[in-house]
Each structure stands twice: as C-alpha cells, then as structure tokens.
Amino acid sequence: MRPEEQLNALRALYSWANEINVDGMAVEVGTFSGENAVVMAKYFNRVVTIDPWLNGYDKDDHASSADMAEVEKKYLERTEPFTNISHIKLPSIEASKQFDDGSIDLVYLDGDHRTEAMVADIDAWKPKVRPGGILAGHDINIESVHNALKQRFMGVVAQIFTDSSWGIII
C-alpha cells in the first residue's frame, strides 16, 4: 500500500493537471496493484493502465519479484468499481503503439526504473502526449530514473511533488 503522503502528492499532481485543462485520457505505465489508477480515475475521464505483470525485469526492484498473479488479482478487485479504467496487459513499448501521437492528456511512468528502460519509455510515450499535456512519473529520487530524465530533459523545468513524482508539460 502506498502511504497517504504519496496518495496526497498524486492528488496534487492530478489537481495541477486539471487546473491546466488536462483531464481527458490518462495512461499509467506500471500500474502494479492499481492504487494510483483509482486515484487517477477521480481526476480523468478515462484511465488506461499498462502492466504485463511479469517477473524478473529488474533484480534491484522488489516489485519485479512479487507474486504477479496476486498483484493482478488485487488490481482487478481494486479497479472493478471504476467504469472509466481499462487495462492493456502488454509491456510498455508494445502498448504505446496502440495510441496515436498526441492522443493522451497525461502519461504517468512508473514501470521499469532502469535508466535504459526509462529512456525507452520516455521516447515511446512522449509523442503520445498532446501539446499542453503532461508527461509525468514516479521515483525521481532513484538514480536511474533521475539519469533518464537528465538524458531526455536536461534544462527543462519539471514540477516535483512531495512523494518524488515529477511532471513536465509537453
């Protein structure tokens, strides 16, 4: 479970998005058990979550070794009441190909945190965000995520939220 402080920071991120008219479709890459998706569903008309629920992608990430059948079950239980949440059970890059460029209001990256994977996610998902939309994510305090952001957005001002979430207006 995410601590209440993290959930409050996510609410702040999505409120900020709504204030600048970003409230249509949101995509969450790396939904895990759906806690963030449920928060998103209250701020966006449509939420699409992406997660293949596969093990072993990163030996340094505890989520990579979780019981993914249980995680998926918890996700389904948690999101079932929300008619505006749907799921694509594919790896991030493959799932990104199902969206037209400029078609998404907000993308939240919280999947594979290795630098090369984050760079690939940024490269795949940034074109999908509409002009004026937001590319955001979690764990800017993790060195690999921070390095990926520096590689792709050096010199760009990002909004940082208290739980280490970040957001950039595209």
Regions found by a protein language model. Name each.
Residues 3-4, 11-170:
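S-adenosylmethionine/decaboxylated-SAM
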